[in-house]
Design a protein with these regions (language model features):
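A short helix/loop element that forms part of the nucleotide-sugar donor recognition site in Leloir-type
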Residues: 39-57, 113
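Active-site donor-binding acidic/aromatic loop of nucleotide-activated sugar
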Residues: 105-110, 122-132, 138
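Short hydrophobic beta-strand element within catalytic cores of glycosyltransferases
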Residues: 168-171
Length: 179
C-alpha cells in the first residue's frame, strides 16, 4: 500500500488498521512535480508583462497568489478575511492579490466571496482569475503564495510547486500541507 503523505498514512492507520495488521508492506511516497516544468529560470519578459497586463496588475506592488479551485474548503474566504486585516495594518495600496481558479459551475460560492471582497473594499486590489495556461509563470510573478485550505488535503501540491519556483509559501497547518 502506498500513501502519498504521512497524513494519509496516519488516516489509513487510524481508520483501516486491518491493512497494517496484515503486515502488508506500506510505503509513504510523496507526490512529485516536474521540476523541469516548474523551473524559475524559464520565462520571457514579454510573457511576464503579458500576464501581468491580463491580470490588470503591475510590478509596483507585492503580488500575493492563492491558486486552487473555488470551493469553500480551499479557504478563499479566510484569505479575503486575512487581506482585510493586512489592509488595516498596511493600508489599501500595499499589494495586489490574485485568486486563481475556476468555480467549476459553483457560481453561488464565487458570488459570495466576491461580495465579501466588495464588503472589505478589496476590489481594486483583489483580482479573480479563472484560468492560467502557464502556472509556473503565475508562481514566478508572485511574491508570496498562499494555500489556505480549511480542511485537510492529502498533499499540498501548491506548496511544492511554489517552492520549486523559489517562492515563499504560507499554508494551513492541516493535512498533508504541513509536510
Amino acid at each position: 500500500i502506498i500513501a502519498g503523505s504521512n497524513f494519509i498514512f496516519s488516516h489509513i492507520n487510524q481508520n483501516y488498521p486491518k491493512y497494517l495488521d496484515l503486515k502488508k508492506k506500506f510505503l509513504v511516497i510523496f507526490r512529485g512535480i516536474n521540476v523541469d516544468y516548474f523551473d524559475p529560470s524559464i520565462t520571457l519578459e514579454t510573457e511576464e508583462n503579458n500576464l501581468l497586463s491580463e491580470w490588470g496588475v503591475n510590478r509596483s506592488k507585492k503580488l500575493i497568489l492563492l491558486p486552487g479551485r473555488l470551493t469553500t474548503w480551499k479557504g478563499q474566504e479566510v484569505f479575503i478575511e486575512a487581506l482585510n486585516l493586512v489592509n488595516k495594518e498596511l493600508g489599501h495600496q500595499s499589494f495586489y492579490a490574485i485568486i486563481l481558479g475556476s468555480d467549476q459551475g459553483r457560481d453561488i460560492y464565487t458570488k459570495k466571496i466576491k461580495r465579501l471582497a466588495e464588503q472589505y473594499r478589496l476590489t481594486s486590489q483583489l483580482k479573480f482569475v479563472e484560468h492560467c495556461q502557464n502556472m509556473p509563470l503565475a508562481y514566478k510573478l508572485s511574491d508570496l503564495v498562499i494555500s489556505a485550505s480549511i480542511e485537510p488535503e492529502a498533499f499540498g501540491r501548491v506548496a511544492i510547486e511554489a517552492q520549486s519556483m523559489e517562492k515563499p509559501i504560507i499554508a494551513s497547518d492541516i493535512g498533508g500541507s504541513n509536510e
